[in-house]
Amino acid sequence: MAAAAFEVPAALTTSESTMAAERAAAPVQAVEPTPASPWTQRTAHDIGGPRTRTGDVVLAEPADFESLLLSRPVLEGLRAAGFERPSPVQLKAIPLGRCGLDLIVQAKSGTGKTCVFSTIALDSLILENYSTQILILAPTREIAVQIHSVITAIGIKMEGLECHVFIGGTPLSQDKTRLKKCHIAVGSPGRIKQLIELDYLNPGSIRLFILDEADKLLEEGSFQEQINWIYSSLPASKQMLAVSATYPEVLANALTRYMRDPTFVRLNPSDPSLIGLKQYYQVVNSYPLAHKIFEEKTQHLQELFSKVPFNQALVFSNLHSRAQHLADILSSKGFPTECISGNMNQNQRLDAMAKLKQFHCRVLISTDLTSRGIDAEKVNLVVNLDVPLDWETYMHRIGRAGRFGTLGLTVTYCCRGEEENMMMKIAQKCNINLLPLPDPIPPGLMEECLNWDVEVKAAMHTYSSPTVATQSPKKQVQKLERAFQSQRTPGNQTPSPRNTSASALSARPKHSKPKLPVKSHSECGVLEKAAPPQESGCPAQLEEQVKNSVQTSVEDSSSNSQHQAKDSSPGSLPKIPCLSSFKVHQPSTLTFAELVDDYEHYIKEGLEKPVEIIRHYTGPEAQTGNPQNGFVRNRVSEDRAQMLVSSSQSGDSESDSDSCSSRTSSQSKGNKSYLEGSSDTQLKDTECTPVGGPLSLEQVQNGNDTPTQVEYQEAPETQVKARHKEGANQRSKQSRRNPARRSSYRVQSEPQEESWYDCHRETTASFSDTYQDYEEYWRAYYRAWQEYYAAASHSYYWNAQRHPSWMAAYHMNTVYLQEMMRGNQ
């Protein structure tokens, strides 16, 4: 198959499509256009275009919407939105709905069910009454936003129409304001229930209740309780519509309890699959480890993308984490990939859907969040990375391809054994023609031609693709000036790599390895990494780079705008990157130093949890001053100490207490030998100790602040020795007899760390002169370490010594490095 890349003009030139793109990419607060806007949005599929349409939407005898006896504004809105001829389900269901009957509508995915209830709702409105008359519920926020866009597009000719969407992730104050003047309310069950409870939404005025994807809304354990609550608050005299592509028999019978003599509108109930959709499956090897199966499926997916030409593809996964991981893998391979899942915020989800519908991405990795109701007409390939849990989900997933009678392709990857048997049961239940994927994949597997609205050009064998500037020259100049001002500030002598790469170093190739972000741990003494010298430069050079980059960006933007004005057309599409499968990539190797940097970055910030470094050795010379990270200070309150005491007492047995007391006594012996071996000059220094306990480090540093109720006296050498002996013996006895006093003593004993630290700070200055031998130097530090832990009677360090978890961490890190080296080989 000849290598080809798909490229289209860079920007839309018509005001209609430009405003549609801005509307879809806007934040949640601006998802709704005003109904009085002078532009119209095309929502319907272009059935008169070059794409093939099957019998799912094409009628044997042509008909039009005027034969359905709709009002004039609705007919004009349908024509403006692009609806030319009704589909079979629209032709049968709209007249029954206009008669006021309760309907249960079942039709194949992508055959125009949203237009059915949107037309019925708009034609039954009384615009002079500004109360909420129609309530539409959808299982996901994305479906609710899509329904709102269809209603506003069809109702563009209805003056004064107020239709709003109410979903989670938006402020309640905004919903309260919109409900003061709202004809049609579209939303998710959770937010609608909340608005009714807060008396923001008056359910007494609702005359039409619509359930889109009714089988999902009434599914047990999903939204059933919320739907029942909302239904009980609505008036008894109302019309109700239930719409879905799949209806289990049990659920269809249960729907009759909500309705008054409902009318079933079913098209092809025995054959729910689309005519123009080819369905394949591929069996992969099964492994005990899940990540091995995922790796093999990913390899098959990349091979499929490289051999099957497609417009847009949807890849479904059963797990959120696996979907995001797959999106990262495909993005690293060069595929324009986006990811959408339920754990993303609302702005990210709407942005991903806007990119899919506006053809700004070729591949969308998703969970079952987008398996229902989402309409993207250019999607002609659906891949199930995991087998769905039920046949309804499978039918909704594959229904994202082949929209409105077009041709499409679906591939399902299943493991050998259980998943394969589950896939066969789904095929038997749905009466579908499921075929094994040919190996090798033939060139003509995708029947639909790709040149219907995409320009095909020969692929260029390049290793770096130029980035397309998406901002205006004025904004680029402002960003460069802000970056230059930040470099000249006295506090920022070392510019961050992020600013330099965004401004003066914008010409860096795309495939270069990015810098790993490093967080500054001010409380731990870890400084942020400075930029390389060649990137920072002097202010004069930086200013010259800024001027040059501004001039080049302005010239490039002006030339691009002139070129676009010549080549663009009203029916063109936004420019997107081409698939990397048609390019030759340069192999990249990593050095051991880069692997170590990657490992340290993963340990510190890989899981987005900052790591506090409590011990940081920078050499004997750097230890003479105040350490950056600081030793354990008196930061534990009495409540925290009481919690530590209770937790240690519940987990420690009697034998643990004995071992701790013996360990303390042995450490006190080491303390005695250390104090006897100390220098005479250190003992001659005046050492003031309070009767109630030694001073804390904060009290020593703040000499002006005198502590209350503390008396000072001289502490000779004998008192220091006796205090350590008695303190070690009394701690082991009092830990058994009076555990309540242990917490207060523990808080008092922590300032001993500070006094030891003051003494240690004075003695370390002479270590470099006294201990010239390397072994003797570390032996002195070992004695100081024993002295420190003898003074710190903290259960944290006891548990650390009793449970050596550092060995487990060492083995884990060893295995991690071995796996990385093995993968590199």
From Swiss-Prot:
Its main location: cytoplasm. GO terms for molecular function: ATP binding; ATP hydrolysis activity; DNA binding; DNA-binding transcription factor binding; histone deacetylase binding; protein domain specific binding; protein-macromolecule adaptor activity; RNA helicase activity. GO terms for biological process: negative regulation of cell population proliferation; negative regulation of transcription by RNA polymerase II; oogenesis; positive regulation of apoptotic process; regulation of steroid biosynthetic process; spliceosomal snRNP assembly. The modification Phosphothreonine is found at residues 552, 689, 706. A motif (Q motif) lies at residues 63-91. ATP binds at residues 85, 90, 107-115. Residues 646-668 have a biased composition (Low complexity). Residues 94-265 form the Helicase ATP-binding domain. Residues 465-475, 484-504, 547-571, 698-711 have a biased composition (Polar residues). It is found in: Cytoplasm; Nucleus, Gem. A motif (DEAD box) lies at residues 212-215. One of its GO terms (cellular component) is cytosol. Residues 300-449 form the Helicase C-terminal domain. CDD domains: DEADc_DDX20 (cd17943), SF2_C_DEAD (cd18787). Coiled coil: none annotated. It is an enzyme of class 3 (hydrolase). Residues 27-50, 465-573, 642-753 are annotated as: Disordered. It catalyses: ATP + H2O = ADP + phosphate + H(+); a ribonucleoside 5'-triphosphate + H2O = a ribonucleoside 5'-diphosphate + phosphate + H(+). Part of the core SMN complex that contains SMN1, GEMIN2/SIP1, DDX20/GEMIN3, GEMIN4, GEMIN5, GEMIN6, GEMIN7, GEMIN8 and STRAP/UNRIP. Part of the SMN-Sm complex that contains SMN1, GEMIN2/SIP1, DDX20/GEMIN3, GEMIN4, GEMIN5, GEMIN6, GEMIN7, GEMIN8, STRAP/UNRIP and the Sm proteins SNRPB, SNRPD1, SNRPD2, SNRPD3, SNRPE, SNRPF and SNRPG. Interacts with SMN1; the interaction is direct. Interacts with GEMIN4; the interaction is direct. Interacts with GEMIN5. Interacts with SNUPN; the interaction is direct. Interacts with PPP4R2. Interacts with FOXL2. Interacts with NANOS1 and PUM2. Belongs to the DEAD box helicase family. DDX20 subfamily. This is Probable ATP-dependent RNA helicase DDX20. It comes from Mus musculus (Mouse). The lineage of its organism: Eukaryota, Metazoa, Chordata, Craniata, Vertebrata. The gene is Ddx20.
